[in-house]
Amino acid sequence: MSSKVEYKPIQPHEEAENHFLQHELHKVKARKYYRCALVVAIIITLVFCILASQLLLFPFLSITSQTTETVLNKDIRCDDQCRFVLVESIPEGLVYDANSTINPSIFQSWMNIITNAKSSIDIASFYWSLTNEDTQTKEPSAHQGELILQELLNLKQRGVSLRVAVNPPDSPIRSKDISALKDRGADVRVVDMPKLTDGILHTKFWVVDNEHFYIGSANMDWRSLTQVKELGATIYNCSCLAQDLKKIFEAYWILGLPNATLPSPWPANYSTPYNKDTPMQVMLNSTASQVYLSSSPPPLSATGRTDDLQSIMNIIDDAKKFVYISVMDYSPTEEFSHPRRYWPEIDNHLRKAVYERNVNVRLLISCWKNSRPSMFTFLRSLAALHSNTSHYNIEVKIFVVPATEAQKKIPYARVNHNKYMVTDRVAYIGTSNWSGDYFINTAGSALVVNQTQSAGTSDTIQMQLQTVFERDWNSNYSLTFNTLSSWKEKCIF
């Protein structure tokens, strides 16, 4: 028997319910769709707002990044034919043997670049005391400093602009030269390094016409020309290097604005492609040279700039035969910190060079009435490494500038103020004393020159600086440290 299949027609109320369910299902799907669309729209809006905010708040962010990359990828070759002149101030009464090398004077170098300036002079300085009035003396030897000041005062009428970045003066007397310059049209900015880094602006350099420059140990002080032993370098016709040094000046200049703060990072226009890893390839005195400028402290160094301490340690580590150092102060401490802090960075690298590589290390350190007694304790520690049994090649001498009774009365004079180092590979001319404070929070700078590729040349800059060091080391003013029963016997007038 076949079964019957009955088909029940859908009742009207069932059909309505089915339509209702389908309608509700479409509504649920629609709500989900609209919710998803709303979420996507909100996300897109937020992203757009963030991007718009960045463009409004940091309009140069992407440009700065691209510019920095462009600066750092710049060709490190320079086509300038630069002329390098090693310059010195030899204090009156300090006389070398007849055959000794005497370099051109810092005074004559400054006069040359002032009188030949065509458009601009920028000077980064610690303080100004170019006249007898500044030091409350009546010294005929102040004449050179007074001439320098007069030439600088006359720049405006020659159409030459003068900018001066200077540390805050510590007394009204130290403000007189600056006030006179401002009255004659110079632009002066006081860089409040004590507030910015808890240090000082200790650097000493000039940039002239973006083409020539001086860098070295001499302050803007008449005593630095006739009563203090100084060393520096003047480089002529070298726009590549001059403009790179000017970037360091511009950093000081911007920090001299009211309520200035340290930028982090520095904008791209302060960056440099020239450093210890990629030095500038340039001709100095017709000799192929690798050159860069270092700076301290680290917060003042823009992208690409080698920090001054890193430069010094790298030069020591790079030496193969010898490291000769001539500085006023040497101490593995932070001299001005409270509480006291030990700071062995440079000291460790010197000991390592002696012990591991048998490098010959010589330190020629200044000795005068303002020397810190603690410095000699640390120097004795270095000198103790040298003995007939150890065969470690490290020697320490102190340099004493002689003084007459009249010269003893000149304040803060009669001292070897040099701040340089020379190795078998590199010449380093700086502006800082060698203790921790000068590299941690004090502004300084240095010129680093390597002419090793031209080892056959008889007059490389390394050789010139080595000659100066050996002249001083072998002079009657240099005393073997181990033979001194008391540093006070020789240093205190």
Curated annotation (Swiss-Prot):
Positions bearing carbohydrate: N99, N237, N259, N269, N285, N388, N433, N450, N476
A biological-process GO annotation: regulation of cytokine production involved in inflammatory response
RNA-binding listed as a keyword: no
Residues in the Lumenal compartment per record: 59-493
Catalytic reaction equation(s): Exonucleolytic cleavage in the 5'- to 3'-direction to yield nucleoside 3'-phosphates
Function: 5'->3' DNA exonuclease which digests single-stranded DNA (ssDNA). Regulates inflammatory cytokine responses via the degradation of nucleic acids, by reducing the concentration of ssDNA able to stimulate TLR9, a nucleotide-sensing receptor in collaboration with PLD4. May be important in myotube formation. Plays a role in lysosomal homeostasis. Involved in the regulation of endosomal protein sorting.
A GO cellular component entry from the record: late endosome membrane
Family: Belongs to the phospholipase D family.
Transmembrane segments: 38-58
Organism for this UniProt entry: Xenopus laevis (African clawed frog)
Residue ranges of every copy of the PLD phosphodiesterase domain listed in the record: 197-224, 412-438
Main location: endoplasmic reticulum
Name recorded for this polypeptide: 5'-3' exonuclease PLD3
Membrane topology of this protein: Single-pass type II membrane protein
Residue ranges annotated as Cytoplasmic topological domain: 1-37
Subcellular location: Endoplasmic reticulum membrane; Lysosome lumen; Early endosome membrane; Late endosome membrane
Coiled-coil annotated residue ranges, if any: none
